[in-house]
Protein backbone atom coordinates (compact mmCIF):
# COMPACT_ATOMS: atom_id res chain seq x y z
CA UNK A 1 0.00 0.00 0.00
CA UNK A 2 1.45 3.30 -1.06
CA UNK A 3 2.26 6.16 1.30
CA UNK A 4 2.49 9.84 0.53
CA UNK A 5 4.46 12.25 2.68
CA UNK A 6 4.32 9.88 5.64
CA UNK A 7 0.54 9.47 5.48
CA UNK A 8 -1.00 6.01 5.66
CA UNK A 9 -4.42 5.68 4.07
CA UNK A 10 -5.75 3.04 6.43
CA UNK A 11 -9.21 3.07 4.85
CA UNK A 12 -7.77 1.76 1.59
CA UNK A 13 -7.06 -1.52 3.32
CA UNK A 14 -10.75 -2.03 4.03
CA UNK A 15 -11.44 -1.89 0.30
CA UNK A 16 -8.85 -4.35 -1.01
CA UNK A 17 -10.77 -7.50 -0.12
CA UNK A 18 -8.23 -8.88 2.36
CA UNK A 19 -9.93 -9.09 5.78
CA UNK A 20 -6.76 -9.73 7.77
CA UNK A 21 -5.07 -6.65 6.36
CA UNK A 22 -8.21 -4.61 6.99
CA UNK A 23 -8.35 -5.76 10.61
CA UNK A 24 -4.69 -4.95 11.20
CA UNK A 25 -5.12 -1.57 9.51
CA UNK A 26 -8.08 -0.75 11.75
CA UNK A 27 -6.11 -1.71 14.86
CA UNK A 28 -3.16 0.50 13.89
CA UNK A 29 -5.36 3.36 12.70
CA UNK A 30 -7.21 3.43 16.02
CA UNK A 31 -4.03 3.01 18.07
CA UNK A 32 -2.29 5.88 16.29
CA UNK A 33 -5.34 8.15 16.32
CA UNK A 34 -5.88 7.71 20.05
CA UNK A 35 -2.55 9.37 20.81
CA UNK A 36 -4.16 12.69 19.93
CA UNK A 37 -6.10 12.67 23.21
CA UNK A 38 -2.83 13.61 24.92
CA UNK A 39 -1.49 15.76 22.09
CA UNK A 40 0.95 13.09 20.91
CA UNK A 41 1.96 12.07 17.40
CA UNK A 42 3.80 8.96 16.30
CA UNK A 43 7.11 8.86 14.44
CA UNK A 44 7.61 8.03 10.79
CA UNK A 45 9.43 4.90 11.93
CA UNK A 46 6.27 3.73 13.70
CA UNK A 47 4.20 4.33 10.56
CA UNK A 48 6.65 2.37 8.42
CA UNK A 49 6.67 -0.46 10.95
CA UNK A 50 2.87 -0.48 11.12
CA UNK A 51 2.65 -0.88 7.34
CA UNK A 52 5.03 -3.84 7.48
CA UNK A 53 2.75 -5.51 10.01
CA UNK A 54 -0.40 -4.67 8.06
CA UNK A 55 1.10 -6.13 4.91
CA UNK A 56 1.94 -9.34 6.79
CA UNK A 57 5.70 -8.95 6.56
CA UNK A 58 6.14 -9.02 10.35
CA UNK A 59 3.94 -9.98 13.31
CA UNK A 60 2.53 -7.47 15.78
CA UNK A 61 4.97 -8.69 18.45
CA UNK A 62 7.88 -8.26 16.04
CA UNK A 63 6.64 -4.75 15.27
CA UNK A 64 6.52 -3.88 18.96
CA UNK A 65 10.00 -5.26 19.52
CA UNK A 66 11.35 -3.23 16.58
CA UNK A 67 9.88 -0.07 18.09
CA UNK A 68 11.44 -0.85 21.46
CA UNK A 69 14.84 -1.54 19.89
CA UNK A 70 14.61 1.60 17.76
CA UNK A 71 14.58 3.85 20.82
CA UNK A 72 17.14 1.78 22.70
CA UNK A 73 19.69 2.15 19.88
CA UNK A 74 18.74 5.62 18.59
CA UNK A 75 21.81 7.89 18.71
CA UNK A 76 20.44 11.03 17.08
CA UNK A 77 18.34 12.48 19.87
CA UNK A 78 15.58 14.98 19.11
CA UNK A 79 13.62 17.32 21.42
CA UNK A 80 10.37 15.39 21.04
CA UNK A 81 11.90 11.91 21.38
CA UNK A 82 10.28 11.26 24.76
CA UNK A 83 6.80 12.09 23.49
CA UNK A 84 7.34 10.18 20.24
CA UNK A 85 8.57 7.16 22.18
CA UNK A 86 5.44 7.14 24.33
CA UNK A 87 3.17 7.49 21.30
CA UNK A 88 5.00 4.77 19.35
CA UNK A 89 5.15 2.21 22.15
CA UNK A 90 1.58 2.83 23.25
CA UNK A 91 0.33 2.59 19.66
CA UNK A 92 1.99 -0.80 19.25
CA UNK A 93 0.52 -2.03 22.53
CA UNK A 94 -2.98 -0.81 21.69
CA UNK A 95 -2.84 -2.33 18.21
CA UNK A 96 -2.00 -5.70 19.77
CA UNK A 97 -4.91 -5.55 22.24
CA UNK A 98 -7.43 -4.49 19.60
CA UNK A 99 -6.28 -7.27 17.27
CA UNK A 100 -6.80 -9.93 19.95
CA UNK A 101 -10.12 -11.76 19.94
CA UNK A 102 -10.33 -12.39 23.69
CA UNK A 103 -12.16 -10.12 26.13
CA UNK A 104 -13.62 -10.34 29.62
CA UNK A 105 -15.97 -7.67 30.92
CA UNK A 106 -14.45 -7.01 34.34
CA UNK A 107 -12.48 -4.56 36.43
CA UNK A 108 -9.33 -6.73 36.28
CA UNK A 109 -9.53 -6.56 32.47
CA UNK A 110 -9.69 -2.77 32.52
CA UNK A 111 -6.68 -2.62 34.84
CA UNK A 112 -4.86 -5.21 32.74
CA UNK A 113 -5.48 -3.13 29.62
CA UNK A 114 -3.85 -0.13 31.28
CA UNK A 115 -0.87 -2.23 32.31
CA UNK A 116 -0.36 -3.66 28.81
CA UNK A 117 -1.06 -0.38 26.99
CA UNK A 118 1.54 1.54 28.99
CA UNK A 119 4.03 -1.27 29.46
CA UNK A 120 7.51 0.19 29.11
CA UNK A 121 6.14 3.75 29.29
CA UNK A 122 4.77 4.37 32.80
CA UNK A 123 6.28 2.82 35.92
CA UNK A 124 2.80 2.90 37.44
CA UNK A 125 1.13 1.08 34.52
CA UNK A 126 -1.71 -1.08 35.79
CA UNK A 127 -1.85 0.60 39.20
CA UNK A 128 -4.84 2.52 40.55
CA UNK A 129 -3.90 6.07 41.45
CA UNK A 130 -3.19 6.62 45.16
CA UNK A 131 -4.23 10.29 45.25
CA UNK A 132 -7.02 12.58 44.04
CA UNK A 133 -6.56 14.54 40.82
CA UNK A 134 -7.82 17.57 38.92
CA UNK A 135 -7.19 18.48 35.28
CA UNK A 136 -7.71 21.85 33.67
CA UNK A 137 -9.75 21.42 30.51
CA UNK A 138 -9.77 23.72 27.50
CA UNK A 139 -13.36 22.80 26.75
CA UNK A 140 -14.29 23.88 30.31
CA UNK A 141 -12.34 27.14 30.05
CA UNK A 142 -9.79 25.94 32.59
CA UNK A 143 -12.16 24.22 35.01
CA UNK A 144 -11.98 20.53 35.92
CA UNK A 145 -14.28 17.55 36.07
CA UNK A 146 -14.76 16.10 39.56
CA UNK A 147 -13.08 12.69 39.31
CA UNK A 148 -13.56 9.71 41.59
CA UNK A 149 -11.99 9.67 45.07
CA UNK A 150 -8.79 7.66 45.18
CA UNK A 151 -10.07 5.63 48.15
CA UNK A 152 -13.16 4.52 46.22
CA UNK A 153 -11.77 3.72 42.76
CA UNK A 154 -12.06 -0.06 42.71
CA UNK A 155 -15.43 -0.02 44.45
CA UNK A 156 -16.76 2.55 41.97
CA UNK A 157 -15.51 0.52 39.00
CA UNK A 158 -17.01 -2.68 40.39
CA UNK A 159 -20.35 -0.95 40.92
CA UNK A 160 -20.53 0.50 37.40
CA UNK A 161 -19.47 -2.80 35.83
CA UNK A 162 -22.05 -4.75 37.81
CA UNK A 163 -24.80 -2.30 36.86
CA UNK A 164 -23.89 -2.71 33.20
CA UNK A 165 -23.62 -6.49 33.53
CA UNK A 166 -27.17 -6.62 34.90
CA UNK A 167 -28.61 -4.16 32.38
CA UNK A 168 -31.23 -5.64 30.04
CA UNK A 169 -30.96 -4.34 26.48
CA UNK A 170 -33.97 -6.29 25.25
CA UNK A 171 -36.80 -4.09 24.05
CA UNK A 172 -34.58 -1.06 23.48
CA UNK A 173 -34.32 0.69 20.14
CA UNK A 174 -30.96 2.00 18.93
CA UNK A 175 -31.62 5.50 20.26
CA UNK A 176 -32.02 4.04 23.73
CA UNK A 177 -29.03 1.73 23.32
CA UNK A 178 -26.79 4.65 22.35
CA UNK A 179 -28.07 6.79 25.22
CA UNK A 180 -27.36 4.03 27.71
CA UNK A 181 -23.90 3.22 26.33
CA UNK A 182 -22.93 6.90 26.45
CA UNK A 183 -23.85 7.06 30.14
CA UNK A 184 -22.01 3.84 30.95
CA UNK A 185 -18.79 4.80 29.15
CA UNK A 186 -18.80 8.33 30.55
CA UNK A 187 -19.28 6.91 34.04
CA UNK A 188 -16.26 4.62 33.76
CA UNK A 189 -14.16 7.49 32.42
CA UNK A 190 -15.30 9.85 35.20
CA UNK A 191 -13.87 7.50 37.81
CA UNK A 192 -10.46 8.11 36.19
CA UNK A 193 -8.82 5.21 38.02
CA UNK A 194 -5.27 5.78 36.75
CA UNK A 195 -2.77 8.63 37.08
CA UNK A 196 -2.42 8.92 33.31
CA UNK A 197 -3.78 7.25 30.20
CA UNK A 198 -7.42 7.04 31.29
CA UNK A 199 -8.99 8.11 28.00
CA UNK A 200 -6.89 5.78 25.88
CA UNK A 201 -7.63 2.88 28.22
CA UNK A 202 -11.35 3.71 28.29
CA UNK A 203 -11.44 3.87 24.48
CA UNK A 204 -9.78 0.47 24.08
CA UNK A 205 -12.05 -1.09 26.71
CA UNK A 206 -15.09 0.43 24.98
CA UNK A 207 -14.07 -0.94 21.57
CA UNK A 208 -13.53 -4.41 22.99
CA UNK A 209 -16.80 -4.31 24.93
CA UNK A 210 -18.85 -3.14 21.94
CA UNK A 211 -17.38 -5.94 19.87
CA UNK A 212 -18.17 -8.47 22.59
CA UNK A 213 -21.88 -7.56 22.48
CA UNK A 214 -22.04 -7.83 18.71
CA UNK A 215 -21.19 -4.44 17.25
CA UNK A 216 -18.85 -3.88 14.33
CA UNK A 217 -16.87 -0.75 15.22
CA UNK A 218 -14.34 -0.72 12.40
CA UNK A 219 -15.25 2.65 10.87
CA UNK A 220 -12.25 4.65 12.17
CA UNK A 221 -14.29 7.01 14.42
CA UNK A 222 -11.87 6.59 17.33
CA UNK A 223 -8.98 7.16 14.95
CA UNK A 224 -10.32 10.35 13.40
CA UNK A 225 -12.12 11.88 16.39
CA UNK A 226 -10.26 10.76 19.52
CA UNK A 227 -9.86 14.34 20.79
CA UNK A 228 -13.58 14.91 20.28
CA UNK A 229 -14.26 11.67 22.16
CA UNK A 230 -12.28 12.95 25.13
CA UNK A 231 -13.94 16.37 25.18
CA UNK A 232 -17.35 14.72 24.87
CA UNK A 233 -16.53 12.64 27.95
CA UNK A 234 -15.57 15.83 29.76
CA UNK A 235 -18.86 17.55 28.90
CA UNK A 236 -20.85 14.47 29.88
CA UNK A 237 -19.37 14.69 33.38
CA UNK A 238 -19.13 18.43 34.02
CA UNK A 239 -21.72 20.42 35.92
CA UNK A 240 -21.49 23.96 37.28
CA UNK A 241 -24.89 25.25 38.32
CA UNK A 242 -23.50 28.69 39.21
CA UNK A 243 -22.35 29.10 35.60
CA UNK A 244 -25.51 27.58 34.17
CA UNK A 245 -23.76 24.46 32.86
CA UNK A 246 -25.38 21.03 33.15
CA UNK A 247 -23.96 17.61 32.35
CA UNK A 248 -24.47 17.09 28.64
CA UNK A 249 -24.21 13.64 27.04
CA UNK A 250 -25.47 14.95 23.69
CA UNK A 251 -21.99 15.21 22.19
CA UNK A 252 -20.98 11.73 23.30
CA UNK A 253 -24.25 10.33 21.98
CA UNK A 254 -23.56 11.93 18.60
CA UNK A 255 -20.17 10.20 18.55
CA UNK A 256 -21.76 6.83 19.29
CA UNK A 257 -24.55 7.43 16.77
CA UNK A 258 -21.89 7.93 14.12
CA UNK A 259 -19.98 4.90 15.37
CA UNK A 260 -22.86 2.45 15.75
CA UNK A 261 -25.63 3.78 13.51
CA UNK A 262 -23.70 5.20 10.58
CA UNK A 263 -24.98 8.73 11.10
CA UNK A 264 -22.97 11.74 10.02
CA UNK A 265 -23.33 14.15 12.90
CA UNK A 266 -20.79 16.96 12.72
CA UNK A 267 -18.16 16.30 15.40
CA UNK A 268 -16.48 19.61 16.20
CA UNK A 269 -14.62 20.30 19.43
CA UNK A 270 -15.45 24.01 19.42
CA UNK A 271 -19.15 23.20 19.73
CA UNK A 272 -18.46 21.69 23.17
CA UNK A 273 -16.85 24.80 24.67
CA UNK A 274 -18.87 25.86 27.72
CA UNK A 275 -20.58 29.25 27.42
CA UNK A 276 -19.02 29.82 23.99
CA UNK A 277 -18.87 33.18 22.23
CA UNK A 278 -21.52 33.55 19.54
CA UNK A 279 -19.15 32.71 16.70
CA UNK A 280 -18.31 29.34 18.30
CA UNK A 281 -21.81 28.34 19.36
CA UNK A 282 -23.40 25.21 17.94
CA UNK A 283 -25.40 26.09 14.80
CA UNK A 284 -29.06 25.15 15.08
CA UNK A 285 -28.69 22.83 12.10
CA UNK A 286 -26.22 20.61 13.95
CA UNK A 287 -28.19 20.07 17.13
CA UNK A 288 -30.40 17.44 15.58
CA UNK A 289 -29.02 14.09 14.56
CA UNK A 290 -28.62 13.33 10.88
CA UNK A 291 -30.49 10.07 10.47
CA UNK A 292 -29.23 7.28 8.30
CA UNK A 293 -31.62 4.90 6.63
CA UNK A 294 -30.00 2.02 8.51
CA UNK A 295 -27.13 1.65 10.95
CA UNK A 296 -23.81 1.22 9.16
CA UNK A 297 -22.26 -0.66 12.08
CA UNK A 298 -24.47 -3.21 13.74
CA UNK A 299 -24.22 -6.56 15.46
CA UNK A 300 -23.45 -9.36 13.03
CA UNK A 301 -25.34 -12.51 12.04
CA UNK A 302 -28.48 -10.98 10.51
CA UNK A 303 -29.19 -8.94 7.35
CA UNK A 304 -26.92 -5.91 7.05
CA UNK A 305 -29.71 -3.47 6.19
CA UNK A 306 -33.35 -2.86 6.95
CA UNK A 307 -35.41 -2.90 3.74
CA UNK A 308 -37.77 0.02 3.46
CA UNK A 309 -41.50 -0.58 3.59
CA UNK A 310 -43.90 0.45 0.88
CA UNK A 311 -46.67 2.98 1.25
CA UNK A 312 -49.53 0.53 1.90
CA UNK A 313 -50.63 0.63 5.55
CA UNK A 314 -51.39 -3.11 5.66
CA UNK A 315 -48.31 -4.58 4.03
CA UNK A 316 -44.55 -4.10 3.90
CA UNK A 317 -41.56 -4.87 1.70
CA UNK A 318 -39.38 -5.41 4.77
CA UNK A 319 -38.40 -9.07 4.58
CA UNK A 320 -37.43 -9.14 8.26
CA UNK A 321 -40.93 -8.03 9.27
CA UNK A 322 -42.54 -10.50 6.86
CA UNK A 323 -40.49 -13.32 8.35
CA UNK A 324 -41.37 -12.31 11.92
CA UNK A 325 -45.09 -11.94 11.21
CA UNK A 326 -45.12 -15.37 9.60
CA UNK A 327 -43.28 -16.85 12.60
CA UNK A 328 -45.66 -15.39 15.20
CA UNK A 329 -48.89 -16.12 13.38
CA UNK A 330 -51.75 -16.56 15.82
CA UNK A 331 -49.46 -17.30 18.76
CA UNK A 332 -48.10 -15.28 21.65
CA UNK A 333 -44.31 -15.66 21.81
CA UNK A 334 -41.57 -14.56 24.19
CA UNK A 335 -38.44 -12.92 22.87
CA UNK A 336 -36.55 -16.20 23.18
CA UNK A 337 -39.30 -18.06 21.34
CA UNK A 338 -39.31 -15.51 18.52
CA UNK A 339 -35.55 -15.85 18.08
CA UNK A 340 -35.94 -19.61 17.80
CA UNK A 341 -38.90 -19.27 15.42
CA UNK A 342 -36.95 -17.10 12.96
CA UNK A 343 -33.74 -19.11 13.40
CA UNK A 344 -31.54 -16.34 14.84
CA UNK A 345 -29.28 -16.14 17.89
CA UNK A 346 -28.14 -12.50 18.00
CA UNK A 347 -30.75 -10.86 20.23
CA UNK A 348 -29.65 -7.26 19.77
CA UNK A 349 -29.53 -7.52 16.00
CA UNK A 350 -32.92 -9.22 15.95
CA UNK A 351 -34.32 -6.37 18.02
CA UNK A 352 -32.81 -3.74 15.72
CA UNK A 353 -33.70 -5.23 12.36
CA UNK A 354 -36.82 -7.29 13.00
CA UNK A 355 -38.77 -6.68 16.20
CA UNK A 356 -38.35 -2.92 16.59
CA UNK A 357 -39.31 -2.17 12.95
CA UNK A 358 -42.28 -4.56 13.23
CA UNK A 359 -43.52 -2.82 16.36
CA UNK A 360 -42.87 0.71 15.11
CA UNK A 361 -44.82 -0.04 11.91
CA UNK A 362 -47.72 -1.46 13.92
CA UNK A 363 -47.51 -5.15 13.02
CA UNK A 364 -46.47 -6.50 16.45
CA UNK A 365 -47.38 -5.40 19.98
CA UNK A 366 -46.74 -6.33 23.61
CA UNK A 367 -49.12 -8.53 25.56
CA UNK A 368 -48.54 -6.26 28.58
CA UNK A 369 -47.94 -2.83 26.99
CA UNK A 370 -48.01 -0.97 30.32
CA UNK A 371 -45.33 -3.25 31.78
CA UNK A 372 -42.61 -3.73 29.12
CA UNK A 373 -40.43 -5.74 31.54
CA UNK A 374 -43.21 -8.02 32.74
CA UNK A 375 -41.66 -11.42 33.64
CA UNK A 376 -44.19 -13.21 31.41
CA UNK A 377 -44.08 -10.67 28.61
CA UNK A 378 -45.16 -11.96 25.20
CA UNK A 379 -45.42 -10.53 21.71
CA UNK A 380 -48.36 -10.95 19.37
CA UNK A 381 -49.67 -9.60 16.10
CA UNK A 382 -51.85 -6.50 16.00
CA UNK A 383 -54.96 -6.30 13.83
CA UNK A 384 -52.71 -4.90 11.12
CA UNK A 385 -50.22 -7.72 11.66
CA UNK A 386 -52.96 -10.34 11.54
CA UNK A 387 -54.21 -8.89 8.26
CA UNK A 388 -50.71 -9.17 6.83
CA UNK A 389 -50.35 -12.72 8.18
CA UNK A 390 -53.58 -13.75 6.47
CA UNK A 391 -52.30 -12.36 3.20
CA UNK A 392 -48.98 -14.15 3.63
CA UNK A 393 -50.61 -17.50 4.28
CA UNK A 394 -52.70 -17.04 1.14
CA UNK A 395 -49.71 -16.08 -0.98
CA UNK A 396 -46.57 -17.73 0.41
CA UNK A 397 -44.61 -16.50 -2.59
CA UNK A 398 -44.36 -13.10 -0.94
CA UNK A 399 -41.85 -14.56 1.47
CA UNK A 400 -39.53 -15.77 -1.29
Each language-model region and where it sits:
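FIC/Doc superfamily catalytic core
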Residues: 1-400
Amino acid sequence: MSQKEGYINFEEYSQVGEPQKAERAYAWSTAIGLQAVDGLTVSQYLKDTAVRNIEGEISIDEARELIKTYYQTKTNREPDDEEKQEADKVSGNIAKIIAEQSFSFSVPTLISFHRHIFEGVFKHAGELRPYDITKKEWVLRGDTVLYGRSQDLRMALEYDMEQERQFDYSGLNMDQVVEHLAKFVSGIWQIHPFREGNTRTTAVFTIKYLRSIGFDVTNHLFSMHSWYFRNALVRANYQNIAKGVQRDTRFLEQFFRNLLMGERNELRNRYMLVNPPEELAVPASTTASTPASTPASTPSNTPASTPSSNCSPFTTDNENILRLVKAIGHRQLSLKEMLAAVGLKDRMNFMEYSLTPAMSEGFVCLLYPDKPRHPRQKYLLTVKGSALYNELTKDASKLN
